[in-house]
UniProtKB/Swiss-Prot annotation:
SMART domains: Inhibitor_I29, Pept_C1. GO terms for biological process: proteolysis. The active site is at C165, H305, N325. It is found in: Vacuole. Keywords: Disulfide bond, Glycoprotein, Hydrolase, Protease, Signal, Thiol protease, Vacuole, Zymogen. Its main location: other. Glycans are attached at N125, N254. This is Thiol protease aleurain. Residues 22-140 form a propeptide.
Length: 358
């Protein structure tokens, strides 16, 4: 074994051990600041392989913050190269004075193609919403709304490396509806939807739609609790048990395709609504503010990610939707993001629906 190989192996062991230490926040604006002995070890170890630069120190802080583990030096160098590209995108975007900011997160060492494979579902044609069934009334809408303040929104979850966003959007809507109807919280099974809802044009880790998931649950007689049917993030055989049902769906209500006025009425006066939109490459690095981008599409065949609209408001003069994601609480603004309202931005009102529970 060469001296270089021995050094590389030792460095990787130190990197992994130090990364398992205290969870330290990442501040890409000041990558040189050393805040713990564990971080100092990571910085020194990574620098031995990649050299000395601000990018290298930023990368070291990133690996420490997110507990990244690489198989060998070659993979570390590859991930560093990708990280540099993403860091440059973050910095160049944030200099433009836009209504939102990007930031380093757990996806900063992934290519766009890798991210697509693990986080996004295949585009779904949500034709069920061409003619909506939501009834708009004359009731006055609140100027702002945040269903979290009513205590009915369940905690942010993490879909992991499975394109099952549609299941988390579905359970998020059902958990909120259940809490609203019965005055208590519940956690429902995403894995049952991954494994069992295929007959309703859903594809497990390859994507699906909340509207179709609601129809499956209605036909099936219910959805099991998370405790009874826990999430694995893999396509498996169906293990539904009627005795473990946590909620039943009486009906589902669709928002007319692209009708943000209907969506605002539903979110403002009824409850959180399952929605879908097109994620493009910059969005995965969202950190704060109101996201907007003219490059994303808004047709039924563009949308590739399902989420949950839990409110709306105005920030610095820009109206927005408040949305719960399923990429963990470390992503974005504690697992949430804001999307510009009024332009069907990225198709935010293209595939919207909500359930009626029992």
């Amino acid at each position: 074994m060469s001296a270089k190989t021995i050094l590389s192996s030792v460095v990787l062991v130190v990197l992994v051990a130090a990364s398992a230490a205290a969870n330290i926040g990442f501040d890409e604006s000041n990558p040189i600041r050393m805040v713990s002995d564990g971080l100092r070890e990571v910085e020194e170890s990574v620098s031995q392989i990649l050299g000395q630069s601000r990018h290298v120190l930023s990368f070291a802080r990133f690996t420490h913050r997110y507990g990244k583990k690489y198989q060998n030096v070659e993979e570390m160098k590859l991930r560093f190269s990708i990280f540099k590209e993403n860091l440059d995108l973050i910095r160049s975007t944030n200099k433009k004075g836009l209504s939102y900011k990007l930031g380093v997160n757990q996806f900063a060492d992934l290519t766009w193609q890798e991210f697509q494979r693990t986080k996004l579902g295949a585009a779904q044609n949500c034709s069920a919403t061409l003619k909506g069934s939501h009834k708009v009334t004359e009731a006055a809408l609140p100027e702002t709304k945040d269903w979290r303040e009513d205590g009915i929104v369940s905690p942010v979850k993490d879909q992991g490396g499975c394109g099952s966003c549609w299941t988390f959007s579905t359970t998020g809507a059902l958990e909120a509806a259940y809490h609203q109807a019965f005055g208590k919280g519940i956690s429902l099974s995403e894995q049952q939807l991954v494994d069992c809802a295929g007959a309703f044009n859903n594809y497990g880790c390859n994507g699906g739609l909340p509207s179709q998931a609601f129809e499956y649950i209605k036909s099936n007689g219910g959805l099991d609790t998370e405790k009874a049917y826990p999430y694995t993030g893999k396509d498996e055989t169906c293990k539904f048990s009627a005795e473990n049902v946590g909620v039943q769906v009486l009906n589902s209500v669709n928002i007319t395709l692209g009708a943000e006025d209907e969506l605002k009425h539903a979110v403002g006066l009824v409850r959180p609504v399952s929605i879908a939109f097109e994620v493009i490459h910059s969005f995965r690095l969202y950190k704060s503010g109101v996201y907007t981008d003219s490059h994303c599409g808004s047709t039924p065949m563009d949308v590739n990610h399902a989420v949950l609209a839990v409110g709306y408001g105005v920030e610095d003069g820009v109206p927005y939707w408040l949305i719960k994601n399923s990429w963990g609480a470390d992503w974005g603004d504690k697992g949430y993001f804001k999307m510009e309202m009024g332009k069907n931005m990225c198709g935010i009102a293209t595939c919207a629906s909500y359930p009626v529970v029992a």
